From Swiss-Prot:
Substrate binds at residues 62-66. Disulfide bonds join 47-106, 61-118, 79-133, 86-94. Gene3D superfamilies: Ribonuclease A-like domain. Keywords: Disulfide bond, Endonuclease, Glycoprotein, Hydrolase, Nuclease, Signal. It is found in: Cytoplasmic granule. SMART domains: RNAse_Pc. The gene is Rnase3. The lineage of its organism: Eukaryota, Metazoa, Chordata, Craniata, Vertebrata. Belongs to the pancreatic ribonuclease family. This is Eosinophil cationic protein. Residues 1-25 form the signal peptide. The active site is at residues 38, 150.
Length: 155
């Protein structure tokens, strides 16, 4: 009896581990990818570090990237502002921020085949921004019905 109970618990733990492993292998949702790409993370204060973290998801060096020094929740709030056409004029799901935020702009200066070896120039500024927003996916937090998925421009 004790052995069967141990075997069933072990089987349950292995099954749970497999489910968690498969869930973590899923690519990020569009809004999770937006957060990875564009929300400033204090753990990576310099462009070289921030872009190394960002580039590990794609395995290559992105030429340019803008990080907004604000929270994901604040950008979600911008999604509630008036709709405007996006830069490509195909979509009308864009929204302008009402306030300037600090930004970090990263520009690739030293490309490399191995993404961890790329080097970036850092430029800081304060700018308004425009984001594209879409309804959340089932894997996004139910806290926000509409989420940012695209940084359209800074101005």
């Amino acid at each position: 009896m004790g052995l069967k109970l141990l075997e069933s618990r072990l089987c349950l733990l292995l099954s749970l581990g497999l489910v968690l492993m498969l869930a973590s292998c899923q690519p990020p949702t569009p809004s999770q990818w937006f957060e990875i790409q564009h929300i400033y993370n204090r753990a990576y204060p310099r462009c070289n570090d921030a872009m190394r973290h960002r580039n590990r998801f794609t395995g290559h060096c992105k030429d340019i990237n803008t990080f907004l020094h604000t929270s994901f929740a604040s950008v979600v709030g911008v999604c509630g502002n008036r709709n405007i056409p996006c830069g490509n004029r195909t979509y009308r799901n864009c929204h302008n921020s009402r306030y300037r935020v600090s930004i970090t702009f990263c520009n690739l200066t030293t490309p490399a085949r191995i993404y961890t070896q790329c080097r970036y120039q850092t430029t800081r500024s304060r700018k308004f921004y425009t984001v594209g927003c879409d309804p959340r996916t089932p894997r996004d937090s139910p806290m926000y019905p509409v989420v940012p998925v695209h940084l359209d421009r800074i101005f």
